[in-house]
């Protein structure tokens, strides 16, 4: 896939972003990429990493735990971290 054909990082799902990031890491670890291309894919990797962190943070904020009343019955939900 050429650089112009790659989708915008912000439009990728978490799973697709991680898969592309893993591919970039593998290419860089092999060491068979020209310096200019290495810099370009490293920069895309940084953007993918940031995007994944943003998506994970958003997912963590959505996770809730169930509150129980004294009888042990579900009473509602609250943020997982208690905030």
Curated annotation (Swiss-Prot):
<keyword id="KW-0269">Exonuclease</keyword>
<protein>
    <recommendedName>
        <fullName>Exodeoxyribonuclease 7 small subunit</fullName>
        <ecNumber>3.1.11.6</ecNumber>
    </recommendedName>
</protein>
<dbReference type="InterPro" id="IPR037004">
    <property type="entry name" value="Exonuc_VII_ssu_sf"/>
</dbReference>
<comment type="similarity">
    <text>Belongs to the XseB family.</text>
</comment>
<dbReference type="GO" id="GO:0006308">
    <property type="term" value="P:DNA catabolic process"/>
</dbReference>
<comment type="function">
    <text>Bidirectionally degrades single-stranded DNA into large acid-insoluble oligonucleotides, which are then degraded further into small acid-soluble oligonucleotides.</text>
</comment>
<dbReference type="GO" id="GO:0008855">
    <property type="term" value="F:exodeoxyribonuclease VII activity"/>
</dbReference>
<keyword id="KW-0378">Hydrolase</keyword>
<dbReference type="Pfam" id="PF02609">
    <property type="entry name" value="Exonuc_VII_S"/>
</dbReference>
<comment type="subunit">
    <text>Heterooligomer composed of large and small subunits.</text>
</comment>
<dbReference type="GO" id="GO:0005829">
    <property type="term" value="C:cytosol"/>
</dbReference>
<keyword id="KW-0963">Cytoplasm</keyword>
<dbReference type="GO" id="GO:0009318">
    <property type="term" value="C:exodeoxyribonuclease VII complex"/>
</dbReference>
<keyword id="KW-0540">Nuclease</keyword>
<dbReference type="InterPro" id="IPR003761">
    <property type="entry name" value="Exonuc_VII_S"/>
</dbReference>
């Amino acid at each position: 896939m050429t650089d112009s054909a790659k989708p915008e990082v912000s439009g990728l799902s978490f799973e697709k972003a991680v898969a592309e990031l893993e591919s970039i890491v593998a290419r860089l670890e092999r060491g068979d990429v020209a310096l200019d291309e290495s810099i370009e894919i490293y920069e895309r990797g940084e953007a993918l990493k940031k995007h994944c962190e943003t998506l994970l943070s958003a997912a963590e904020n959505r996770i809730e735990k169930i509150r129980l009343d004294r009888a042990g019955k579900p009473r509602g939900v609250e943020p997982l971290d208690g905030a």
